[in-house]
UniProtKB/Swiss-Prot annotation:
Reaction equations catalysed: a triacylglycerol + H2O = a diacylglycerol + a fatty acid + H(+)
Subunit structure comment from the entry: Monomer.
Pfam families in alphabetical order: Abhydrolase_1 (PF00561)
Protein name stated in the entry: Triacylglycerol lipase
Residues annotated as the enzyme's active site: S108, D255, H277
Secretion signal span: 1-26
Enzyme class (EC, first level): hydrolase
Domain AB hydrolase-1: residue ranges: 35-280
Subcellular location: Secreted
Annotated cofactor note: Binds 1 Ca(2+) ion per subunit.
């Protein structure tokens, strides 16, 4: 009788093990070989009053095994200055984590920022991923650049934007930092982007809207972006992004601030997510399109892609 009674128990244990096995696999779904480092865009931050710039993304990646670090650089400055600041933090993360390399992911102006690091220190990173980044410039930046340089209008606007950057920096890090909105504008317009690309061409497509080299100097390049400025009527940022999308010429597909073709770098995962520029980092507060995959899921899938590539 005792032997018979063990059979159902054994079956139960076996079934429980089978049921549990997907959970065990899921726990390492985002466990990349090297840590993931996130780099914010213009007027970005790491955390303000408990709210992450990368809303819900770091915790979702960590939950299934990823080692994630969130960086903060100048809210407003040139790609090179921001890149040098990020490089210093990457070197610190490498020392802290004990890993020789990190996977960099940059949103918006964070895209050119991580490209700078990849170009000058490719030994520190196996991959560079850009999300909604204006690698060939932004029509919105070109529109703003029409304000005459040195004019009173430029001085007033740059002063206001610098003040906003200083406030964001203070709320996030306790210091106003150095803000250079004109430096950001020069980096993000078409002419400035072309100059940057001439110095750091790695991963940039040679055609108007194609893909770039998938791998350069040991660094794998990836990108994705959205193409829908208006996605959720409850999201207060949609009104601003809907207005800014009007600066794009000839019906150019865009996310409200960046054209889809300009966002291409290396392997293009996708450039037509139903997301706007802030949806790409799951903002504002996760109010994204109900008819598109969650931005958090996109980051999780990419972490798994990096894992499967042994990165």
């Amino acid at each position: 009788m005792k032997k018979k009674s063990l059979l159902p128990l054994g079956l139960a244990i076996g079934l429980a093990s089978l049921a549990a096995s997907p959970l065990i696999q899921a726990s390492t779904y985002t466990q990349t070989k090297y840590p993931i480092v996130l780099a914010h865009g213009m007027l970005g931050f790491d955390n303000i009053l408990g709210v992450d710039y990368w809303f819900g993304i770091p915790s979702a990646l960590r939950r299934d095994g990823a080692q994630v670090y969130v960086t903060e650089v100048s809210q407003l400055d040139t790609s090179e200055v921001r890149g040098e600041q990020l490089l210093q933090q990457v070197e610190e993360i490498v020392a802290l984590s004990g890993q020789p390399k990190v996977n960099l992911i940059g949103h918006s102006h964070g895209g050119p920022t991580i490209r700078y690091v990849a170009a000058v220190r490719p030994d520190l990173m196996p991959s560079a991923t850009s999300v909604g980044a204006p690698h060939k410039g932004s029509d919105t930046a070109d529109f703003l650049r029409q304000i005459p340089p040195g004019s009173a209008g430029e001085a007033v606007l740059s002063g206001l934007v610098n003040s906003l950057g200083a406030l964001i920096s203070f709320l996030s890090s306790g210091s106003a930092g150095t803000q250079n909105s004109l430096g950001s504008l020069e980096s993000l317009n078409s002419e400035g982007a072309a100059r940057f690309n001439a110095k750091y061409p790695q991963g940039i497509p040679t055609s108007a809207c194609g893909e770039g080299a998938y791998k350069v100097n040991g660094v794998s390049y990836y990108s994705w972006s959205g193409s829908s400025p208006l996605t959720n009527f409850l999201d207060p940022s949609d009104a601003f992004l809907g207005a800014s999308s009007l600066t794009f010429k000839n019906g150019t597909a865009n996310d409200g601030l960046v054209g889809t073709c300009s966002s291409h770098l290396g392997m293009v995962i996708r450039d037509n997510y139903r997301m706007n520029h802030l949806d790409e980092v799951n903002q504002v507060f996760g109010l994204t399109s109900l008819f598109e995959t969650s931005p958090v899921s996109v980051y999780r899938q990419h972490a798994n892609r990096l894992k499967n590539a042994s990165l």
